[in-house]
UniProtKB/Swiss-Prot annotation:
Cell compartment(s), UniProt: Cytoplasm
UniProt: ATP binding residues: 247
Binding partners and assembly: Monomer.
Residue ranges annotated as motif 'HIGH' region: 12-22
Top class in the EC scheme: ligase
EC numbers, comma separated: 6.1.1.17
Family assignment from sequence similarity: Belongs to the class-I aminoacyl-tRNA synthetase family. Glutamate--tRNA ligase type 1 subfamily.
Single biological process term from Gene Ontology: glutamyl-tRNA aminoacylation
Main localization (coarse): cytoplasm
Motif ('KMSKS' region): 244-248
Presence of keyword Cytoplasm: yes
Protein name from the UniProt record: Glutamate--tRNA ligase
């Protein structure tokens, strides 16, 4: 008998941005489907009408696209499936696996207070649940009932969690939860079940904040005669300080990492190592990750987010990246700043100079901007470095630059000849030259900077300071 094709899903609620925890869930679900030749489904759980927004949906789609987590089916929207949910609820009412409940809020509040006074766990008491020989109250006039699920009253719900191991919950711990509100709208736990059933989901990979939902969802699936998927609940992500990851730990939105100059390849690599490992391997490609990924090596303990490690990874990926790719990314960032990317030398040349000393794309763009815009150094920097002695040396050097062959070796010799003429050491010429050309005292090798900047720009910028 052929194995059931793998079908995983990512099902975010569009009430905000795509955060790091959600991105990791999406990555693991996507990788599992790719590893097993399966299908990855994107589902938007937008039943919280008050908080769901089109902007949040777009932010999720943008984040997925930036990370390169392409879905095979979807996105499916729960609000577009309401008729299907209501159809299944009617089937359950007819089958006796669900029932109408007319208990008012006041009655539920009184029941809760009574149970709490007795130190009992608050739960619905089943007063409207049909049973053989039981006479139900007369439905009150003008009251719209909710629909509750007939949760089993005996036995246990058990599943072998692919991360946490065997989990068993006694059905006596669960009550008859609401699957449709009084206005007829189905609840989250019910919609999820119908979606997973209809979409043939085989593995549900999600955060462990959903563990408590799982026994209820399994019971509904079994009541529907549906196949129960395997579940894998991922541990939470903690911040650098060991507390739950939040805004105070820095960027939490995936697209914020784009804004801050991280490469998607670096973020993917880092997310992959948040709770999963393959021996001591720290750096690997997306393709290698898919080949290696399994659920057996996901740790059940909380993962800790380490910004320094992410920064280290990002710097590594920038060093290894193709110069043309980096130049295109830098050009986009310059354009967003209002800087013409074509106002300076070829960005690929600038990128080649600076990629080994840049931790992110924004640092690369900062450097490139100095080549595109004639930057004026701060007055105190000019006062410190462009002394009369330095200006005299730069005037001699400018004259040499007018005639010299424009290659690194010849430019280096021109600088050395100027040093000899004025009795100066390399820093006494190179630092003022950096300040005059780029407005900063520190750059890569000065002869390389001069070569890339080009004769016309070098002469013009020197003339401005010597005028």
């Amino acid at each position: 008998m052929a194995a059931t094709p793998v079908r995983t899903r990512f099902a975010p609620s569009p009430t905000g941005y795509l955060h790091i925890g959600g991105a990791r869930t999406a990555l693991f679900s996507w990788a599992y489907a790719r590893r097993h030749g399966g299908r990855f489904i994107l589902r938007i759980e937008d039943t919280d009408v008050a908080r769901s927004t089109p902007e949040a949906v777009q932010a999720i789609l943008d984040g997925m696209k930036w990370l390169g987590l392409e879905h095979d089916e979807g996105p499916f929207y729960q609000m577009q499936r309401m008729d299907r949910y209501k159809e299944v609820i009617q089937q359950m009412l007819a089958a006796g696996t669900a029932y109408y409940c007319y208990t008012s809020k006041e009655e539920l509040d009184a029941l809760r207070a009574e149970q709490e006074a007795k130190k009992e766990k608050p739960r619905y008491d089943g007063r409207w649940r049909p049973a053989p020989g039981k006479t139900l109250p007369t439905p009150p006039a003008g009251v719209q009932p909710v629909v509750r699920f007939c949760n089993p009253t005996t036995g246990v719900v058990a599943w072998d969690d692919l991360v946490k191991g065997r989990i068993e919950i006694s059905n006596t711990e669960l009550d008859d939860f609401i699957i449709a509100r009084a206005d007829g709208t189905p609840t989250y736990n019910f919609c999820v079940v119908v979606d997973d059933w209809d979409m043939g989901i085989t593995q549900v990979i999600r955060g462990d904040d959903h563990v408590n939902n799982t026994p209820r969802q399994i019971n509904v699936l079994q009541a529907l005669g549906a196949s129960v998927p395997q579940y894998a609940h991922l541990s939470m992500i903690l911040g650098d300080d060991g507390t739950k990851l939040s805004k105070r730990h820095g960027a939490v939105s995936v697209m914020q990492y784009d804004d801050e100059g991280y490469l998607p390849e670096a973020v993917i690599n880092y997310l992959a190592r948040l709770g999963w490992s393959h021996g001591d391997d720290e750096i690997f490609s997306r393709e290698q990750f898919v080949e290696w990924f399994d659920l057996d090596h996901i740790t059940p303990s909380a993962a800790q987010f380490n910004t320094e490690k992410l920064n280290w990874l990002n710097a590594h990926y920038i060093k290894q990246a193709d110069n043309a790719y980096l130049a295109a990314e830098v050009a986009n960032r310059l354009a967003r700043r209002g800087v013409d990317p074509e106002a300076g030398p070829a960005l690929e040349q600038v990128v080649a100079l600076y990629k080994d000393r840049s931790a992110n794309l924004n640092e690369l763009a900062d450097a490139a901007e100095l080549f595109c815009v004639d930057v004026h150094a701060a007055p105190e920097v000019i006062a410190q470095h462009l002394t009369d002695t330095a200006r005299a040396a730069l005037a001699s050097l400018r004259a040499r630059f007018e005639a010299v062959a424009w290659d690194k070796a010849a430019l280096n010799q021109a600088i050395k000849d100027t040093m000899a003429e004025h009795g100066l050491k390399m820093p006494q010429v190179a630092i003022p030259l950096r300040v005059a050309l780029l407005g900063v005292p520190q750059t890569p090798s000065i002869d390389a900077v001069v070569e890339v900047l080009g004769r016309e720009r070098v002469l013009a910028r020197l003339a401005r300071h010597l005028g």
